[in-house]
Curated annotation (Swiss-Prot):
<dbReference type="GO" id="GO:0030248">
    <property type="term" value="F:cellulose binding"/>
</dbReference>
<feature type="binding site">
    <location>
        <position position="171"/>
    </location>
    <ligand>
        <name>O2</name>
    </ligand>
</feature>
<feature type="binding site">
    <location>
        <position position="182"/>
    </location>
    <ligand>
        <name>Cu(2+)</name>
    </ligand>
</feature>
<dbReference type="GO" id="GO:0005576">
    <property type="term" value="C:extracellular region"/>
</dbReference>
<keyword id="KW-0964">Secreted</keyword>
<feature type="domain" description="CBM1">
    <location>
        <begin position="323"/>
        <end position="358"/>
    </location>
</feature>
<dbReference type="GO" id="GO:0004497">
    <property type="term" value="F:monooxygenase activity"/>
</dbReference>
<keyword id="KW-0136">Cellulose degradation</keyword>
<keyword id="KW-1015">Disulfide bond</keyword>
<keyword id="KW-0119">Carbohydrate metabolism</keyword>
<dbReference type="GO" id="GO:0030245">
    <property type="term" value="P:cellulose catabolic process"/>
</dbReference>
<feature type="disulfide bond">
    <location>
        <begin position="155"/>
        <end position="243"/>
    </location>
</feature>
<feature type="signal peptide">
    <location>
        <begin position="1"/>
        <end position="16"/>
    </location>
</feature>
<feature type="binding site">
    <location>
        <position position="17"/>
    </location>
    <ligand>
        <name>Cu(2+)</name>
    </ligand>
</feature>
<comment type="function">
    <text>Lytic polysaccharide monooxygenase (LPMO) that depolymerizes crystalline and amorphous polysaccharides via the oxidation of scissile alpha- or beta-(1-4)-glycosidic bonds, yielding C4 oxidation products. Catalysis by LPMOs requires the reduction of the active-site copper from Cu(II) to Cu(I) by a reducing agent and H(2)O(2) or O(2) as a cosubstrate. Degrades various hemicelluloses, in particular xyloglucan. Active on tamarind xyloglucan and konjac glucomannan. Acts on the glucose backbone of xyloglucan, accepting various substitutions (xylose, galactose) in almost allpositions.</text>
</comment>
<feature type="glycosylation site" description="N-linked (GlcNAc...) asparagine">
    <location>
        <position position="189"/>
    </location>
</feature>
<feature type="compositionally biased region" description="Low complexity">
    <location>
        <begin position="251"/>
        <end position="296"/>
    </location>
</feature>
Amino acid sequence: MKTGSILAALVASASAHTIFQKVSVNGADQGQLKGIRAPANNNPVTDVMSSDIICNAVTMKDSNVLTVPAGAKVGHFWGHEIGGAAGPNDADNPIAASHKGPIMVYLAKVDNAATTGTSGLKWFKVAEAGLSNGKWAVDDLIANNGWSYFDMPTCIAPGQYLMRAELIALHNAGSQAGAQFYIGCAQINVTGGGSASPSNTVSFPGAYSASDPGILINIYGGSGKTDNGGKPYQIPGPALFTCPAGGSGGSSPAPATTASTPKPTSASAPKPVSTTASTPKPTNGSGSGTGAAHSTKCGGSKPAATTKASNPQPTNGGNSAVRAAALYGQCGGKGWTGPTSCASGTCKFSNDWYSQCLP
């Protein structure tokens, strides 16, 4: 299927949130949906034991396999809808600012990335970022206009892999199944590299439990601040893979700085109404552990700072106070000044700070 047909099918069904849709390699944009296994819409996965937790509910699969040299700076781009923003004043692109949480990247070695299935694969984590100095990985993604970066480990064996990018939104994670998982997989071929064979692999489903401290968690401190109450945040999943001494591997996105990086392209298909969200306050859940939002490199070196993408940053606009909220959008809560009715679904109370349009 041609990319244009994929775009039309995906954009027509998109409604809210975010979707992984592009890869860059050493600053070179690989193209919209090239090498990407794409879901039918940008809705989250909420069941950690569902098969959708692997690569999402894939309905479109591109045949390209992207070449990634070992040690390359790899970017993964997220947008509210395929192509990025839902419109010129889409304040929720690349994702609603209320959707705080971590970002991770996993790899699984495969024989043929274009045709392999996703069940039974062994995954190892090559990048992670959580909460650091009051800022979440999602905050840096938004500041970077949808791009997040990591360094491909220099020591992993050459060959084909599935690359699983994941963003977890924790704004409503105080109750079980409240965390929202946004996931996508890319098909890559690593060139160069070494012979390291990661031992700390995990399976999906199975790597996460619904009660893990980084998944069932109240991230709100005093006055509704999203600082996890000043406590460290424990990133879900296995320990970050690192190369033996002398090689580099395992990294985390750094704070955004201004530079020139790949620019997402816009889809020509019509866009649905965007979802407006703001900071809710769940009433239960807990967070503990030792969070890790810094880079991990063997040999003591640090990854390059994340750079700011050149695609335009949408501005907050529109008359949200008079329009209905989209499915999964916020429709109430203390201090909420946006829509209080739902274009689809029913406005359901979650806690004093957050009500949401649900099916």
